[in-house]
Amino acid sequence: MKITYCDALIIGGGLAGLRASIACKQKGLNTIVLSLVPVRRSHSAAAQGGMQASLANAKKSEGDNEDLHFLDTVKGSDWGCDQQVARMFVTTAPKAIRELASWGVPWTRIKKGDRPAVVNGEHVIITERDDRHGYILSRDFGGTKKWRTCFTADATGHTMLYAVANEALHHKVDIQDRKDMLAFIHHDNKCYGAVVRDLITGEISAYVSKGTLLATGGYGRVYKHTTNAVICDGAGAASALETGVAKLGNMEAVQFHPTALVPSGILMTEGCRGDGGVLRDKFGRRFMPAYEPEKKELASRDVVSRRILEHIQKGYGAKSPYGDHVWLDIAILGRNHVEKNLRDVRDIAMTFAGIDPADSEEQTKDNMQGAPTNEPEYGQAMAKQKGWIPIKPMQHYSMGGVRTNPKGETHLKGLFCAGEAACWDLHGFNRLGGNSVSEPVVAGMIIGDYFASHCLEAQIEINTQKVEAFIKESQDYMHFLLHNEGKEDVYEIRERMKEVMDEKVGVFREGKKLEEALKELQELYARSKNICVKNKVLHNNPELEDAYRTKKMLKLALCITQGALLRTESRGAHTRIDYPKRDDEKWLNRTLASWPSAEQDMPTIEYEELDVMKMEISPDFRGYGKKGNFIPHPKKEERDAEILKTILELEKLGKDRIEVQHALMPFELQEKYKARNMRLEDEEVRARGEHLYSFNVHDLLDQHNANLKGEHHE
């Protein structure tokens, strides 16, 4: 039996895994990265719109800082995130942007002078300062107070992945693709690597290491309609679950992106709306301002997805053979802007829908017939233009994943996790656009360093016989799938699982349907034990791969559905129509799912409390819908009083905003990442002879004083 030894084993070749591999090589570790696909084809490349970091370079970004990015992230999560992790993230993100620039990412840059833009559906002129010429530009994204999303046109993930992959190769990281991790090797609650199948030869071998980091991405493919690539099936997270020790966090927290192309499901980046694109119904009316007057199309993703579906349910969706949808109008931005800044979107729309989204030519007035005249809140009907893109919400992102602490350590010692595969818990119950492509790079930096330190100190304490036993177990399972007498077809089971998840565990959830979904998923899981693969070869066998992955996917589907059924509240992307309020009194916690015994047919669910008294920002009104639509935590007022007292006392002592922040909620972070981020406006403050950072303490005070002005719950 073949066994390969290394210091650091990283499973997953996207942004998180590759950035962590660089951290390991920088400490002199023998590092191996295993990937299902050539690493430059990892799903990180599909990210289009941009990466959030508070640089405050451009006109619409002025005044931005870590505090505002932190506030947006916490509110966006519907107070479900780990606030210490959010602080680590927002502090490191500006450094990550500049590191990526030094590695060759061609960030779109500021050009001095006037530039046209579309804001709130209106054409405006933005004037950039001469002294900011050449600095990194940011665009607007949903749920943010400032234009913070740095970008490379609409191919941000692609350029980032290529730059990080090149840097990993420069450091001579051993990258091996076409490798599929089947199971983790573990003993005495410690992880020592993984059993791996070569997708080309079918050979099953072991990779034994001092430390293992999982970075295999999300689990979107358990749904039928998703923007995720075929490799995003959650098998890595499921393998962690199957150890019986590692736990999954917040699996019911599944994000549905508002603008997926109909019918293909390919993502139409949030940058379309961030740059000024608008959503229209079948009558050509812009409808989002009627639902969300402040943020409109740039409300958080969970909010926009719900509003689109609500509008369709009212009968305002455009008809198509693939179901009702609404229109995304970016022709309003002008052909020059679309062809320059949204060229991938244009190419996708033309290739997969036969639509040129820059085309503003009037196509027909048929859609205006029968348009209501007594609903002025939705605006005036207008003739459909050729360039409007058909879109509707589809599964997009996994907020849940393998539960880790802020250092990336899982419940299984020696196993770390980073990126979308992890529940680090940066995103809580809703992720902000632009934080996804940020997270794997930032997590790869932070967790990669902690992981490398672990590998430097750890020892391999497992004998060859135990490793070979893990290999044999996987070999026996492959033999069983190929030669058992079962009659079940893997594709029939997999397809029905996806349909159940779409129909009953989607954007809107309800107890009875969740119970039905749970029952059917249990039946499918039982049937999956009798799958027999028709193609009998071990090598180059996609049917065999689908067979062993489908059982893992069903375990994840059960975790998602059981978590959704038990959580009797609505929080972020988890919307229970039978429990419409967010309930901080009962549900300010994190769901933990485990599978301690292979004999179980359901996950074990427990909860991890979020401590209000340690939060920098206590749970409050999120800014969408009715202000009273949540049940406050009983300790909220006590924590608010503590926060306010601390801010006022430290302000009197002349402390700056960063010193105030550390007093409110200390957090651990490597010194090189915790160092203060410098911005161009800091130099202007120095030039005026003012105390650096002190001018922002009042912003922090306003943020925590809002409850005294009646801006939280009623």
From Swiss-Prot:
Function of the protein? The fumarate reductase enzyme complex is required for fumarate respiration.
Name the cofactor(s). FAD
Q: Is Lipoprotein one of the keywords UniProt gives this record? A: no
Instruction: Write down how the cofactor binds this protein.
Output: Binds 1 FAD covalently per subunit.
- Annotated SUPFAM superfamilies: FAD/NAD(P)-binding domain, Succinate dehydrogenase/fumarate reductase flavoprotein C-terminal domain, Succinate dehydrogenase/fumarate reductase flavoprotein, catalytic domain
User: Where, in this chain's numbering, is FAD bound?
Assistant: 13-16, 42-44, 49-50, 420, 436-437
Compartmental location: Cell inner membrane
Record's keyword annotation contains Signal: no
Query: Which reactions are catalysed by this chain?
Result: a quinone + succinate = fumarate + a quinol
Name a single GO cellular component.
plasma membrane
Gene (name only): frdA
Among Pfam families, the record links this protein to:
FAD_binding_2, Succ_DH_flav_C
Q: Which residues form a coiled coil?
A: none
What name does UniProt use for this protein? Fumarate reductase flavoprotein subunit
- The species this protein belongs to is Helicobacter pylori (strain J99 / ATCC 700824)
**Which family would the database say this protein is a member of?**
Belongs to the FAD-dependent oxidoreductase 2 family. FRD/SDH subfamily.
Keyword list (alphabetical) reads:
Cell inner membrane, Cell membrane, Electron transport, FAD, Flavoprotein, Membrane, Oxidoreductase, Transport
What's a BP term from Gene Ontology annotated to this protein? anaerobic respiration
What residues form the catalytic site here? 257, 273
EC id: 1.3.5.1
Q: Tell me what topology the record assigns in the membrane.
A: Peripheral membrane protein
Per the record, residues carrying Tele-8alpha-FAD histidine are 43
- Main localisation, per the record? membrane
